[in-house]
């Protein structure tokens, strides 16, 4: 599955200690603004997540994708009020060839849901890997517990219910 991921999702999966498994089992792309938000700026501030994400890029497990957004897509971004990093995610997805967007930004998810764009939240990605038999039930619960404090209670409990 070919995924365009935003900063929020990438950071949450990193903190859940499952990002490595995600990037090894899915074809994950991030746009330049997400790279800036998750690597360039945080590295300068000494955040360890940034170094882990950069390592995945260096190993080819994560790809920076460039979009060729047309004027129509740019107008959609402006009229829908899509934010900084998410605008790059949206442009990359609309450039074609991607299956889903991974995000946990509520406002962005409402917009892409209304547009019929498929998406998975970080917890849903973990459950997806469980359903694909990449993760055991025990591993899945451990990863969900790792992410519990940084996702909504609803997200967490829905994901747990899917696994049990």
Predicted regions and their residues:
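Conserved SAM-binding loop
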Residues: 101-102
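Acidic, PIN/NYN-like endoribonuclease modules and their adjacent C-terminal/linker elements
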Residues: 109-164
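Active-site-proximal, substrate-binding regions of enzyme catalytic domains
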Residues: 1-96, 106-109, 113-117, 155-164
